[in-house]
């Protein structure tokens, strides 16, 4: 690893240095990175444009890929939360990382839709001002919380039912002991 990639202490600067180093080593002209994320789930695609202008999917070094995971939390905005989609790119000619982000777009991760829990956990992990909560996220988070409340009510009913059964069983055992005819002296009535 070069000294240049170790110097930046901020995640974006570190990622920029690692990506620049990898791009130069790969001999590419440009790299584009597409990052969809919500909560702890994400999908990242890297596309390299080689010197002949051909675009191809690539998989950079592990160090480059892992460094990107620190960028999103570091860029959290106190009002908008964390972005959900980002396009990062770098031209080998200038070695500067560029970025555009979207805080409102519903991420597309694989073929699975974003789950209700993902939306709720995203809001817990990266809170947002109400005007920065997209409708799709609000609907999914509300559905998750409604289901969680329903499950908690069911668990409470189950706890109460078990407690009643336990009390009934204890009462029945006590009643059975009384019905056997024993008194406090241990003598049996005849």
What is each of the regions a protein language model found here?
Residues 1-54:
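N-terminal "first-domain core" detector
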Residues 3-10, 14, 59-66, 124-131:
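Alpha-helix boundary/N-cap detector
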Residues 21-25, 74, 139, 168:
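Surface-exposed polar/charged interaction patches
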Residues 31, 86-88:
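Short, structured motif recognition centered on aromatic/hydrophobic residues
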Residues 35-63, 81, 98-112:
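Extended intrinsically disordered, low-complexity coil regions enriched in Ser, Thr, Gly, Ala
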Residues 59-80, 86:
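Short, solvent-exposed interaction modules
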Residues 89-93:
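Short beta-strand micro-motifs enriched in acidic
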Residues 98-190:
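Acidic, proline/glycine-rich low-complexity IDRs
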